[in-house]
Amino acid sequence: MPYVSPPGAGQTNIKSLNLYDDNIGTLHPTYVKLALMREKCRDVVSGQDIIKSKTTKYLPKLSGQDDASYKNYLNRALFFSIGAKSLQAIVGMASLKRPKVTAPTDIMEKYFNFTENLTFIEQYVRMVSEVSLQNQAYAYVEWPSNGGDAYTVILPAESVINWDYDDNGDFSLVVIKEDYWKKVSRYKREFVVRHRELTIENGNYVQNIFENNVKVKTITPMVLGQPLKKIPLVAFHSKGLGISDEPPLLLDIANINISHYMTSADLEHGRHFTGLPTPIITGASSDNKLYIGSNQFIVLPDKNANAKYLEFTGQGLASLEKALQEKQSMLASLSARLLDNSSKGSEATDAVKLRYLSETASLTTVVKTINVVLNMLYNIIAESLRESPKSVNIVLDTDFLGTQMSHTDMSALFEAYIGGAVDLDTLIYNLRVGQRLNPESTDEEVKAEILKRKNEIAEAAKKENPQPQPNNPQPNTSEK
């Protein structure tokens, strides 16, 4: 599932925030420019309940429609969460294979023990999800005040509301809007918003906590007994490091998804009224009660009277149905055809790859950028643990369209290995690229298993086909 931020994230009400006042809640102009677009994208991937809770924001009232009629109109509408499905597919492609990590033993045990701790994988999935959705995300390293292990914090685009740089281009100010549940009694929790300011004061990195625009706490993170000189935060987007002012990547999908939703509302509205035939009678008095049913008689006193059902005819609904199909096809194309139901028959592997190459180019760039960010973050952590600042190396897989090696190719590969045409390392490499190995296994484990089985086969062959023993001449006992 794609990451969905906690309550409040992405629900920016610009009118309620300070755009230009000089306080901790002031919004950066770039944040203001993108806020409504980001809110729309977040709502679309959050699903039907969130979309419908915004009522007329995404589904305007029809002309002359009262509240009761609009409520029925809204309830009948169907929001097809294609945006969420697209994001889910993108994240699934990016996280199909686990990363390869080399790091000092203690760091491997603390942060990259994927058998017992999936925190790193969850962080990676969230980073891909946020950048693929909003074209912006942030991450920084945090050190607990109690002296525990350092950890990374991933922030969605909506959380960082203001920032500034020093003369060297490094961050000198980052303001984070934090939504959290505050304990007000033993049983009661209250949802509140506070601000965390990451800044440089007197040459040192500090965090200032604000509640209701009042600073309530200052924290100075210490590493190896010394304060940091830079803010350990990295901003990144779909094309590299830094803060982008470009629209969210899923904005086009979100716009068509909402248009699809409005067309669905009109179609269901029309079906509701046209799908229920209305009985009418002409040429008869309306003074008496009339009944419909096989056990009742209807008497029409006038010879010209007539009774019938008024039913819908025409092409009005067909045009709405066609519009839905067209918009769904547009969504499928924009979301890399992941939802395309077109019948193309059985395509060769190379044909499938070529058809998707351009569509995965953006995802490849996103993953490569995140790869750089993760190495930056975990090498900051490594340095704080007295390790070399380049002792951690994380490699994320970008072969999203890799297909499984066929049985024929695998047999030919093993024959080449047995015949001496390829060495063992080449064999293992091709088996791994061809997705014929357990992703949890290491190359050393696979090598040991192949050699073990090779020896077992050789021993079994010796037993089935024993080598003939040479005839030893028997001593001549008759000679003295």
Language-model features, listed with the residues they occupy:
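Short, charged/polar micro-motifs that form catalytic or ligand-binding hotspots
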Residues: 129, 250, 310, 314-322, ...
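Extended, charged amphipathic alpha-helical segments
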Residues: 218-349
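A structural detector for beta-sheet-dominated domains
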Residues: 15, 20, 35-37, 142, ...
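Extended, helix-rich architectural segments
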Residues: 1-152, 462-480
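Amphipathic alpha-helix face/heptad-repeat signature
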Residues: 127-131, 256, 320-323, 327, ...
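Extended, regular secondary-structure scaffolds
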Residues: 128, 132-239
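C-terminal helix-loop subdomains that flank or include functional centers
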Residues: 326-480
